[in-house]
Amino acid sequence: MRNIISILIRNEAGALARVANLFSSRAYNIDSLSVAPTDDQSVSRITLVTFGSQDILDQIIKQTRKLIDVISIIDMTDDDYHEREFALIKIEVGSISNDNLNLLMDNYGATILSEKDNFYTLEIISSSEKVDEFIGAITAKIPIDSIVRSGALAIAKGKPLLQKNS
């Protein structure tokens, strides 16, 4: 099962490493990970995606809560939330007709960010599922030179689920 976990941690050296080590020590793979400061520079938000059983995930969440730098943690999987992922994809100009490329980009809301040295850099911001679909649609037609992805970002709809003072 795919799980999206959101964690507020103190923005201090080693805090992220302690969280990652906890997952690693339990042989629980992190599929994607994004970390950045919140509006309060002393607090960072970790958004991570992992796959696995609910029992193991529940155990890891309980143990993560005990880490000294963790302020709060929640499994957002069953909540109502917005999810976005950002990807940059580099392809060679002329490897696909402009009409076909434009049709693909229109279908997924992607854009051409730049054209330089006979390469396009494409940009897409969507759900992880749609980003995967777009990459699949592109690779079905042409080779991708390079790709970089942000990993999933998620935030609850409505009232915040994570509290900085918990």
Walk through the language-model features, giving the residues of each:
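Long, contiguous binding/interaction regions
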Residues: M1-I4, L8-S44, V49-S166
